[in-house]
């Protein structure tokens, strides 16, 4: 079966609270992540909660990139879903984690699709965790 889409669900911890608490900064990061992931941006919306936290989404022709943040915990929940052949969601995820200065990431990749003429849904789930080494600004 051909995969219709790649859905990355990311738990990011140890993030810089100043970055993940700034809706404008996150928008900037997501727009660049979409570019690096070879995605075509269609729209974006970000909302800053009071007193803290951000939720936002970038709609791309290939699907979406979304986030919910808890700066007080240094935590961000990311969702990157793409379909088609040209997008590279992993590049987008890597860039976002780097910009958030995440110290730890748990990533699940779900390969999504449906069998042609069968209406049988197929999901393949790959999961990995990594402690991110960010000494001297290098991953």
Curated annotation (Swiss-Prot):
Q: What class of enzyme is it?
A: lyase
So what does this one do?
Catalyzes the decarboxylation of S-adenosylmethionine to S-adenosylmethioninamine (dcAdoMet), the propylamine donor required for the synthesis of the polyamines spermine and spermidine from the diamine putrescine.
Give the gene name.
speH
| A Pfam family the protein falls into | AdoMet_dc
Coiled-coil residues: none
What is this protein's name? S-adenosylmethionine decarboxylase proenzyme
Site-annotated residues for Cleavage (non-hydrolytic): 62-63
The alphabetized UniProt keywords are: Autocatalytic cleavage, Decarboxylase, Lyase, Polyamine biosynthesis, Pyruvate, S-adenosyl-L-methionine, Schiff base, Spermidine biosynthesis, Zymogen
Q: InterPro entries attached here?
A: AdoMetDC_C, AdoMetDC_fam_prok, AdoMetDC_N, S-AdoMet_deCO2ase_core, S-AdoMet_deCOase_pro-enz
Supply the source organism for this entry: Pyrococcus abyssi (strain GE5 / Orsay)
Cofactor(s) the protein requires to work:
pyruvate
């Amino acid at each position: 079966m051909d995969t219709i889409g790649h859905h990355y669900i990311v738990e990011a911890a140890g993030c810089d609270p100043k970055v993940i608490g700034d809706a404008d900064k996150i928008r900037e990061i997501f727009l660049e992540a979409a570019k690096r992931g070879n995605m075509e941006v269609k729209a974006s919306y970000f909302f800053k909660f009071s007193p803290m936290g951000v939720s936002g989404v970038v709609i791309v022709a290939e699907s979406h990139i979304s986030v919910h943040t808890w700066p007080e915990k240094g935590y961000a929940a990311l969702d990157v879903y793409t379909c088609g052949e040209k997008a590279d969601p992993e590049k987008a995820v890597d860039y976002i984690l780097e910009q958030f200065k995440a110290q730890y990431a748990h990533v699940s990749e779900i390969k999504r699709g449906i069998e042609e003429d069968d209406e049988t849904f197929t999901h393949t789930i790959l999961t990995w965790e990594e402690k991110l080494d960010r000494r001297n600004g290098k991953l």
